[in-house]
């Protein structure tokens, strides 16, 4: 595989494992095994089941989560050591998405209870990237090909298209704002006489909620997370104005949380685990 640059979608946050075992037991999260995982786990065949999809096997779960979880401890880790754990376990809370131009995106999942403010080390980032490449191995080029866009244009509004680079610049400009007042002014710059395409009432509601719920101190973090979601490109299949409205709606949802990281975790559960 040709060497490639990765883009880090999160800035200003890091994580520290707090040994809560949530990643081993959260609803909707499954551990899929590649060929090398199967070789490492030959002594744990009783905990493996076949499945459909790009990976043919996964770990079994019960009502408490992974069947190899015992008193909040991993049986593999205890009996064999960290290096014998499945790759997906070692990668968490990181994962990968593919940008419109084929660039791999390193993401961090906010439903990990160890997410916190801070700067993540280059060592941790590089280890996560290497583990992801090992997990997908000879599938990675196909994943990139299938995940990227093959059209040079994207919709801003219905029937109005621009280059992907321009849309990316718009999103970065809007959501790098430090306050919602600044974000609104930047939206006015970008959308001009189409500003009414945005849910302006919800922007006002966000500012009111920051006062009502006494969460004004979370304003900058909420905007930082919205920029992170924009970098992940969850909503790039939508016209850009609808993506902005989606992110505004998420920002409004987060204003109700005193612990904003808990709210971000709930959003990420919906995005990654399809939990309602």
From Swiss-Prot:
Pfam families in UniProt:
CxxCxxCC
Q: Which domain of life is it from?
A: Archaea
This protein's name: Uncharacterized protein MJ0939
Record the organism. Answer: Methanocaldococcus jannaschii (strain ATCC 43067 / DSM 2661 / JAL-1 / JCM 10045 / NBRC 100440) (Methanococcus jannaschii)
């Amino acid at each position: 595989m040709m060497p490639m640059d990765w883009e880090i979608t999160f800035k200003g946050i890091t994580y520290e494992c707090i040994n809560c075992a949530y990643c081993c037991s959260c609803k909707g999260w499954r551990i899929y095994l590649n060929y090398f995982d199967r070789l490492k786990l030959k002594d744990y065949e009783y905990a493996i089941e076949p499945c459909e999809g790009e990976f043919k096997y996964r770990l079994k779960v019960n009502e408490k989560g992974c069947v190899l979880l015992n008193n909040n401890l991993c049986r593999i880790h205890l009996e064999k050591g960290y290096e014998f754990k499945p790759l997906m376990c070692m990668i968490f809370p990181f994962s990968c998405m593919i940008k419109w131009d084929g660039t791999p995106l390193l993401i961090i999942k906010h439903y990990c209870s160890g997410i916190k403010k801070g700067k993540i080390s280059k060592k941790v980032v590089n280890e996560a990237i290497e583990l992801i490449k090992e997990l997908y191995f000879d599938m990675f080029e196909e994943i990139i090909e299938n995940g990227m866009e093959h059209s040079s244009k994207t919709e801003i509004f219905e029937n109005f298209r621009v280059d992907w680079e321009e849309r990316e610049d718009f999103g970065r400009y809007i959501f790098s704002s430090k306050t919602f007042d600044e974000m609104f002014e930047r939206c006015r710059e970008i959308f001009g006489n189409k500003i009414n395409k945005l849910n302006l009432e919800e922007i006002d509601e966000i500012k009111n909620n920051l006062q009502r719920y006494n969460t004004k101190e979370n304003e900058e973090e909420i905007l930082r997370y919205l920029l992170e979601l924009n970098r992940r490109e969850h909503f790039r299949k939508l016209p850009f104005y609808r993506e902005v409205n989606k992110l505004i709606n998420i920002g409004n949802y987060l204003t109700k949380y005193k612990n904003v990281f808990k709210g971000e975790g709930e959003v990420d559960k919906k995005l990654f685990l399809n939990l309602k």
